[in-house]
Amino acid sequence: MTEHPNGALAWVNGSDAPEKSAINLGFMALTDCASVVVAATQGFAQPYGLTLNLKRQSSWAGLRDKLVSGELDAAHSLYGLIYAVHLGIGGTHPCDMAVLMGLNQNGQSINLSRELQALKVTSPEALDRHVHQSRARLTFAQTFPTGTHAMWLYYWLASQGIHPLRDVDSVVVPPPQMVAHLQAGRIDGFCVGEPWSASAVQQDQGFTLATSQAIWPDHPEKVLGCTRAFVEQYPNAARVLVMAILEASRFIEHSPENRRSTAQLLSAADYLNAPLDCIEPRLLGAYADGLGNRWQDPHALRFHHHGAVNLPYLSDGMWFMTQFRRWGLLREDPDYLGVARHVQQLELYREAASALGINPWGQDMRSSQLIDGKVWDGSEPAAYARSFRLHALNDSPALAAQR
């Protein structure tokens, strides 16, 4: 299955050999763990002298704790989790963290309950009216207080005129438990990664109101995260780990057939433990929202895109810090660029990509327009954090992520 460019395997010889051959690699039961699972199980790591021991976790808080303690060497992780732990707002003491590469873009969703559907709350405008006119306060679930799902949920609600910290309640629910919580009536909606949004639609437990790629086309999502200590102690192991997962990412996107075989692999009990028909369609970009609408999404879940997905852009890391500031999680502006340069392992990533003949991309920043029309390009992050009409900059106490 694996073919290596000339010179790629030179990394496993001599002084460039990995200092650690067995890597404990954490992941959550989400479709976007695909490149990690494929790398570990389909022969992409062994040529580099690595054995990847996959360790499925039941919650992001548990994954965080094992990553910080060293029980996990690296993990499929939320972008916002890595930065929150680094900044000391992630529910643990501050710990120097590292982003080795991006694992995916797009592919998360906001779903609402069948009860709201029965009340004809099936559009952003209807949700805005309901929130501001109903006496009953809605409860939305996300997966970790500083995670990507919390940030997409907050950003999307705010773009519709709904203050995510004042107008609705927010709770943390692990991804695989989302559908059960919705079915039990404990929550009115959620933001989560696949396959759990599609699963809710398949089980007739509500509908998909918005996708994360509608909020920010080709947004950053999961990363390969670890502690800075791991990179410093095992730099060669970190580099070839990136190479193995880069090759797996490229393989998944090589053809629709490879995406289908990946969906089949992920459906197994050891990984997502979910029906194939909840995984495969949206992995192939085929969406059905549960309201009768179907479309082929041009910004569906992607893992590689010639390396554009995988570069740990400085601006991506900085964006999450601007949102922590916006929502009162940070009480003062961090050194946005300085922190991002410390966390994002750009040099190591580019060495790995270049060795595989993958475009290492010369730009450390990228520019995007989000759903509210605002452009984010990494410039003036402090001003950007202050530029939003809805925020919690001055009147919310500092919050910390809890279990």
Outline where the language-model segments fall:
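Short, glycine-/small- and polar/acidic-enriched structural segments
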Residues: 2-165, 171, 188-198, 205-218
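Inter-helical turn/loop segments and adjacent helix faces that build the functional surface
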Residues: 163-168, 232-237
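Secondary-structure end/capping motifs
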Residues: 235-343
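Short glycine- and hydrophobic/aromatic-rich loop-to-beta-strand nucleating segment
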Residues: 110-111, 223-226, 230-231
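Conserved C-terminal helix/tail region of periplasmic/extracytoplasmic solute-binding proteins
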Residues: 318-403
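Short gly/pro-enriched beta-turn/loop segments at secondary-structure junctions
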Residues: 218-219, 261
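Functional cores that coordinate and move charged inorganic groups
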Residues: 175-176
